[in-house]
């Protein structure tokens, strides 16, 4: 909005934006609304095999999206989950050692893995919603084949989940008492 520091203007803008999304992409709107909590998002990630993570890069004013397969088990309820970017061929990673996979998970450059913070609002959409809204991404057959390979390789998935569960994420010391209020996350997260 033009009113950079006007909260009411921001709210009105968001309301109008959501109305437009609901009008143009009703199924995506429904997916947005039904995945606002961590639990509902994780349940959504369990139901489908292919999602797209969308980004707007402000510096270059470009958008980008990558297809991914969520790596979850039935007990996954962590704040971060690993996803595999389906632009990469998973067969190239199945035989890597635990240490090699760990290095890839810790690296963001040239890695097929990303870590999603599921306790935050994420710009993702499922392939099934895209199809219902008549939006067919390129290379869909390739993504389906790769997702199937990942889904069938439970040993690989378990290795990735184990690596992620053993990560130690940095925690920063709070210098002021006010900073400690939400230092362990929000109660509903």
PLM ranges: what are they?
Residues 1-189:
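DEDD superfamily 3′-5′ metal-dependent exonuclease/proofreading module
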């Amino acid at each position: 909005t033009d009113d950079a520091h006007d909260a009411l203007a921001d709210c009105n803008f968001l309301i109008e934006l959501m109305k437009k999304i609901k009008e143009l992409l009703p199924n995506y709107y429904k997916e947005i609304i039904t995945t606002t909590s961590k639990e509902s998002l994780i349940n959504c990630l369990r139901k489908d095999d292919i999602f797209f993570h969308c980004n707007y890069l402000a510096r270059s004013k470009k958008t980008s999206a990558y297809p991914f397969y969520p790596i979850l088990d039935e007990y996954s309820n962590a704040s971060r989950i690993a996803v595999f970017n389906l632009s990469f061929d998973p067969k190239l990673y199945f035989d890597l050692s635990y240490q090699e996979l760990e290095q890839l998970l810790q690296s963001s450059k040239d890695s097929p893995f990303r870590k999603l913070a599921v306790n935050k609002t994420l710009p993702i959409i499922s392939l099934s919603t895209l199809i219902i809204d008549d939006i067919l991404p390129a290379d869909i057959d390739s993504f389906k084949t790769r997702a199937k390979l990942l889904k069938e390789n439970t040993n690989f998935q378990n290795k990735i989940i184990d690596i992620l569960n053993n990560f130690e994420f940095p925690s920063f010391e709070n210098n002021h008492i006010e900073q400690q209020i939400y230092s362990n996350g929000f109660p509903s997260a």
